[in-house]
Design a protein with these regions (language model features):
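Short secondary-structure transition hinges
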Residues: 78-82, 111-139
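Short, basic, alpha-helical segments at the C-terminal edge of helix-turn-helix-like DNA-binding modules
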Residues: 38, 46-47, 76-84
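HTH DNA-binding helix-turn interface
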Residues: 16, 41-42, 56, 62-72
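Hydrophobic alpha-helical connector segments
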Residues: 82-116
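Amphipathic alpha-helical packing segments from all-alpha helical-bundle domains
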Residues: 124-159, 167
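C-terminal peripheral helix-coil segments that are non-catalytic and often amphipathic
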Residues: 1-9, 174-197
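Hydrophobic/aromatic-rich alpha-helical bundle segments in the mid-to-C-terminal region
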Residues: 147-189
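Basic, helix-initiating cap at the start of DNA-binding domains
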Residues: 1-40, 44-53
Length: 197
């Protein structure tokens, strides 16, 4: 096993460990919320029960998820990374193709989509939380798109690419963000062909 030997190695090792711990905590909260909401419904579960089951405090819970519905669905926060924003705004390429890249680097699809779909089917009260998450993701992307083109073009292009996100989530397994961008471009292309068929 590699032992850290330099200050840089120690910092990188610490950051890696810290990031793994965050992912483990997030995953524990999600698993607990998913199990409890599946068994008892959204109204039948409290944040405190989720926290007790996951072994975290309510303060920790709210550092990871804004609500018990989002925790049960495993919906991550949607923020545009500065590097993706700068690449999109600085590009002179095709708007929709560039938006596919921006969305792929901004919107993180839930890891366990199969269980998420099962939860939504079993507990329809979860649908509004999912729709709200999608609307927030769309608004986040739209705000950046509107910095590059007029608002009408930004809205139409963003709506098209977000529809491709939904379709892509139904079709494919996980992959890298670059693979997601390629899938989004393929789905958008298919939508265009269907629209003119």
């Amino acid at each position: 096993m590699h032992q850290p030997t330099t200050t840089e190695d120690l910092v990188a090792s610490d950051c890696g460990l810290r990031e793994r711990k965050k992912q483990q905590t997030r995953s524990a909260i999600h698993r607990s919320a998913l199990a409890l909401v599946t068994d008892h419904g959204l109204a039948g579960v409290t944040v405190e029960q989720i926290c007790a089951d996951a072994g975290v405090s309510p303060r920790t819970f709210f550092n990871y998820f804004p609500s018990k519905a989002e925790a049960a669905l495993g919906l991550p926060a949607t923020t545009v990374p500065e590097t993706a924003r700068a690449a999109f705004l600085g590009s002179t390429g095709a708007l929709v193709a560039d938006l596919c890249d921006l969305v792929a680097h901004t919107v993180t699809l839930p890891q366990d989509r199969r269980r998420m779909k099962e939860l939504v089917r079993a507990r329809p009260e979860m649908v509004p939380a999912m729709m709200q998450w999608m609307a927030h993701a769309r608004q986040t992307v739209l705000a950046v798109a509107a910095e590059r083109v007029d608002e009408d073009a930004a809205r139409t292009a963003t709506t098209l690419v977000m529809a491709a996100v939904i379709e892509s989530a139904h079709r494919s397994a996980d992959g890298s963000r670059d693979e997601l961008a390629a899938r989004l471009r393929a789905v958008v292309g298919e939508m265009g062909r269907l629209a003119t068929a």
